[in-house]
């Protein structure tokens, strides 16, 4: 497992967190402030860690989060955003509960859905607000066997997640 420290600057929003990239997994570059990693490709399994500004509205609902928002309220915004996404079909929320993420109060969602290409995903979605940012850590995999096969690997990534102190460059 390699520890990846992410700090980003320039014209894009800065983000700052650390997470372990499992051995045998690769990261995929993105213009967005996020870390995307997969072992067998995004249509098999992936882990996505993202930081977004609280001021940035979500794409489909145009709703934003705010400082002091309860984790349950933030979770509801995420569920409504997913339900509004035209690329998501057959969405079913299996669980919505409180969670601790790197020492922060947040939430965990477990859900299944079909994407626009017909792939069925099962997802664990963790989220929390810290300062002016919303952080989410998502694990998704197609088919139950892929989900179970890499669940322990995701748990190691999740446990390795910390907010960093690196300066944007």
Regions found by a protein language model. Give the residues of each.
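Bacterial signal peptide processing site
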Residues: 7-9
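Signature of long, low-cysteine stretches enriched in small and polar/charged residues
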Residues: 73-128
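Extracytoplasmic/secreted proteins, especially bacterial periplasmic and envelope-associated proteins
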Residues: 20, 73-81, 152-156
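Second-shell loop/turn segments in exported
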Residues: 60-69, 96-98, 143-148
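A mature extracytoplasmic/lumenal domain signature
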Residues: 23, 31-32, 110-115, 125, ...
């Amino acid at each position: 497992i390699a520890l990846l420290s992410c700090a980003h600057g320039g014209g894009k929003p800065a983000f700052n967190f650390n997470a372990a990239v499992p051995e045998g997994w690769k990261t995929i570059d993105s213009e967005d402030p996020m870390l995307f990693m997969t072992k067998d490709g995004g249509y098999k399994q992936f882990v996505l860690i993202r930081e977004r500004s609280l001021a940035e509205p979500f794409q489909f609902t145009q709703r934003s989060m705010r400082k002091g928002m309860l984790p349950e309220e933030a979770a509801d915004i995420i569920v409504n955003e997913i339900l509004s996404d035209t690329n998501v079909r057959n969405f079913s929320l299996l669980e919505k509960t409180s969670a601790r993420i790197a020492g922060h109060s947040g939430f965990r969602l477990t859900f299944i859905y079909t994407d626009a290409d017909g792939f069925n995903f099962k997802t664990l979605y963790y989220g929390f607000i810290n300062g002016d940012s919303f952080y989410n850590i998502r694990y998704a995999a197609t088919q139950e066997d892929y989900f179970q096969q890499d669940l322990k690997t995701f748990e190691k990534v999740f446990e390795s997640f910390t907010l960093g102190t690196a300066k944007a460059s």
